[in-house]
Amino acid sequence: MAKKGKKIVAAQQKVDADRKYDISEGIDTALQARFAGFDESVDIAVRLGVDPRHADQMVRGSVVLPHGTGKEIKILVFAKGEKEKEALDAGADFVGNDELIEDIKNGWFGFDKAVATPDMMGAVGKIGKLLGPRGLMPNAKTGTVTFDVARAVNDLKAGKIDFRVDKAGIVHAPLGKASFGTEKLQDNMLALLRMLVAMKPATSKGAYMRSLAVSTSMGAGVRLDPLLVKDAVK
């Protein structure tokens, strides 16, 4: 087994694996435990008390992070007529209809998010097998199938993220960049957690937020105290 580098060991020693932190101290600890030489992303994993095998316990949605994600994204909008101009005026990077669909069929995926007007979904659905696995399929539940394309583009540019519980009942989401600092990352985390609480399924029993961990891209996971988090999101 390969030995861990000194930087990795030193970083891991800054995290008390037996402790559960409050939000602010947890984020601060994760930032202190960095060792990579770049501005790492900061992410959170939240294990929910849901069984995603049941449709009524599938937690899926979106939220606009108040300080954004720190990542510049390219947005594609499937639209026709006046909605094309509306999307361009809002700052969309690629706007069109049939020609964009053909480009995607030919293997082009030079965008990070896709929005579609409802009248385009019949055509867009035909490339669903190409978009879906890449997380690029527009979806009404996340606000990316809409005639209000300007708002959809503005929200995405402002830092809107999508989240979805996985098969293990865990939601993984980005909170921003390490350079944001503890305060901004905490604001972003609270926005996400409050949305998760608001979306709690009526059929979910017992504790809802079972466990939480925050980490940088390369750093060690820092566990948060679910009870302290629950108090913070009220």
Swiss-Prot record:
GO MF annotations for this entry? rRNA binding; structural constituent of ribosome; tRNA binding
- The keyword Isomerase is assigned to this record: no
* One Gene Ontology term from the biological process aspect of the record: regulation of translation
**CDD domains in UniProt:** Ribosomal_L1
Q: Which UniProt keywords apply?
A: Repressor, Ribonucleoprotein, Ribosomal protein, RNA-binding, rRNA-binding, Translation regulation, tRNA-binding
Keyword Signal listed? The answer is no
Matching InterPro entries, A to Z?
Ribosom_uL1_bac-type, Ribosomal_uL1, Ribosomal_uL1-like, Ribosomal_uL1/biogenesis, Ribosomal_uL1_3-a/b-sand, Ribosomal_uL1_CS
Q: Name one GO cellular component term.
A: cytosolic large ribosomal subunit
Fill in the subunit field for this protein.
Answer: Part of the 50S ribosomal subunit.
Q: Which family does it belong to?
A: Belongs to the universal ribosomal protein uL1 family.
Function (record text): Binds directly to 23S rRNA. The L1 stalk is quite mobile in the ribosome, and is involved in E site tRNA release.
Return the HAMAP family for the record. Ribosomal_uL1_B
Q: What is this protein called?
A: Large ribosomal subunit protein uL1
